């Protein structure tokens, strides 16, 4: 059976996983930026991560005949530090021209905090400024329904965003 992996965090996987996916019929991989299990402490850490997503992972996937696509963002779990978030949002445009970048994501909320909401709004603004697709992340920790409503409201309230370009 042929399929596309819509949400694979391949930076944390081995090449054996790429091989198994290819043998199982995978035709392409889409990898959203995600939390690494710990908070990155600097913009340089994110720069290196974005290089991994836009340069290294496409080469690893290509060894098994798989196109690799990615989404870029600062994950909601790392959005509490507004200074760091601003710095990270500032470098994302450098990577948008990479041929494997699909858009901004996975963005959203985790604890539904004010800082997360502010960074979500900044992500949506960045996507609008650069006409990028948006991939949404719904909350894990707090009220999922409330968080999802907040996310939808942010997207709906930005008239530059076409809802058909949001996943």
Residue ranges and their predicted role:
Residues 1-167:
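Mid-domain alpha/beta scaffold segments of enzyme catalytic cores
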């Amino acid at each position: 059976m042929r399929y596309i992996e819509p949400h694979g965090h391949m930076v944390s996987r081995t090449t054996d996983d790429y091989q198994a996916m290819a043998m199982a019929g995978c035709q392409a991989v889409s990898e959203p930026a995600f939390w690494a299990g710990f908070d990155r402490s600097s913009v340089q850490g994110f720069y290196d991560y974005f290089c991994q997503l836009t340069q290294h992972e496409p080469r690893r996937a290509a060894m098994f005949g798989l196109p690799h696509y990615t989404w870029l963002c600062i994950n909601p779990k790392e959005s509490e530090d507004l200074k760091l978030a601003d710095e990270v949002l500032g470098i994302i445009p450098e990577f948008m021209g990479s041929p494997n970048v699909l858009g901004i994501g996975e963005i959203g909320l985790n604890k539904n905090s004010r800082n997360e909401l502010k960074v979500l709004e900044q992500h949506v603004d960045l996507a609008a400024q650069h006409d990028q697709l948006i991939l949404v992340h719904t909350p894990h920790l707090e009220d999922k329904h409330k968080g999802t409503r907040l996310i939808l409201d942010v997207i709906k309230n930005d008239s530059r965003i076409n809802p058909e370009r949001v996943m």
